[in-house]
Amino acid sequence: MEPGELMEVDTSQELDENTSAKETDQPKDAQNDPEIVCGDSNEVKKESPSVEEDQSSTETMSNEFEVAAAILEQENEDSGQNAPSLGELLSRSVNNYHPEHYSSPPLMRKPDFRFPIINPEKAQGKLFVLYQLIITVPDSLKKFPPYTSETNCLFSENDVDFWIYKVNSVIEQAPSNALILPGFNPDTNVNFSETVGEFINRSKGFVKKPNLEQIKAVIGAVIDIKAAVEYSSMKANRPSKNKVRSKNSNSEQKRTGNFLSQVVENLMTKVDANILSRRVGKLFKNHNECTFCNIKFISFFEMCRHVGSIQLRMKINHLRYQDVHVGTWVRFLASATPQKQTIEDVIDGGSSKKVHSPEIIYID
């Protein structure tokens, strides 16, 4: 080259190397997530409304996932291990799942192709668990946005698992006095020593004979989610902060939903369906469905049997009911047993034997 001549430099190779280097320097999360976070500007790229661009973006991400799978397979071959299955690759990618990088709550996004869409049956169970956790300490969960007004959105199972983990973390870190629904507090004077049979015999002596409105209230708090939340939030069901009551007080004792269900199951073995329908059957039109289990009943007797079933028992096990609440179930179910003879029944049968009703102690 002679003096004064400019040296021609081939920069195409350098540009290719710089471009590939920039792509390699991007965060791992930004390469994997559907909404890519830019490294320097911290701005989220919005998805184009164009269908063609969405398809090309999905194909690009699929190619990246295939490349990552090929790299992992090559690494395993070099190390003498078997190649991972697709399920293992998906489970590994959960570690790269960070919803806080997205610009919208999980349920507002389009599905992530890396995670299979959850089926409706499994989603119902998981969302019910999440709902139960949310209504336990809602004040502590206001900083989390797992709520959405969209009713027709698809989501992955990992989205729900993430928020269940978040909510559980809040509950574990919260002090006991932060739980605003005392009905969900597992340490509220629960009597574990008394058996189901002992409680049934004892409650006949301290619970008033309930009217239809009281029966309606106790049924709703067991088979209706909304009524159960209202029952747990009632002022009368909250522990007093100003005065300490005796732990032996019936009004302060708490029973688990599991215990209530066992009491009902025990009583339903002796209940006559016709007597029960004649006495309280008019309440059936308002209590013909269990929103905990999403089941509709064909009769009042069938509804009561469901309360004593294992299916509902598992759903309401964490709930806490007052003694008088469970005792009300005892009183109105025991009154529908054919073994209980009244004075009128004996007279109608032509017997001259006098029957005395048991003495009932009423406690307000």
From Swiss-Prot:
Residues in the signal sequence: none
Domain of life the protein comes from: Eukaryota
Basic and acidic residues: compositionally biased ranges: 19-31
GO molecular function, one term: phosphatidylinositol binding
A GO CC annotation given for this chain: early endosome
GO biological process terms held by the UniProt record: endosome organization; endosome to lysosome transport
Bias kind Acidic residues: ranges: 1-17
Record-annotated disulphide pairs: none
Name of the protein in its database record: Uncharacterized protein K11H3.4
Region listing for Disordered, in residue ranges: 1-61
